[in-house]
Amino acid sequence: MIAPPNTYAQWAALLTTFVAGTADEEAVHAMRAGTLVWQSGVAERFTQRLLDALNTRIQKDGDTFSRDLARASAEQDTIAALLAQRRRFRTLYAAADLPALPAATRKETIAAVQTAADRTQESLEASAKTDRTGRMSALVRSHRVNVLETEAFS
C-alpha cells in the first residue's frame, strides 16, 4: 500500500513510481487520496512535474500498444491490444483527474490525456481505412481507445 502524498517531495517520489508503471493501481489510488498545499512556486513545479509524468507514460504506453498491435496475429489479439490501451489511457485519466488539483489545472491535465487518446483513436481509424475488408475499421470503432471517463479509481 502506497501512502497518500502530502508534500512536494512525497508527490515527486510517487510520480516517479507512477512513471515506472510498476504499481499503477496503488499509485493512482494514493495520488487521488493525496493533498498538496497549493502555493506559488510549488503549484507551477508540481503541475509541470505531473504533466511530464503523464506525457512520459503516454509515450511509454503508446510504445507498448504499438508492440501489442504488431504482434497481433488474430482478431482477438487486436481486440485485446485495443482494450489494454483503453485501460492504460483510463489509468492516465484517473491520474490526471486528481482531487488535489484546482479546477483549471485539473482541466488542463485531463485534456492532455484525452487529446492523446483522441489522436490515437484518429490514427487507428485512418490506418484501418486501408483494410479492404472493413473488418479492422469495425474493430477500431467498436473498441475505441478514447472512451476514458470511468469510476474505476474513485
Descriptions of predicted regions:
Residues 1-43:
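Leu/Val/Ala/Ile-rich N-terminal alpha-helices, chiefly Sec-type signal peptides and the beginnings
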Residues 1-2, 151-154:
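Short intrinsically disordered terminal tails
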Residues 35-144, 151-152:
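Long, low-complexity or tandemly repetitive, helically biased scaffold regions used
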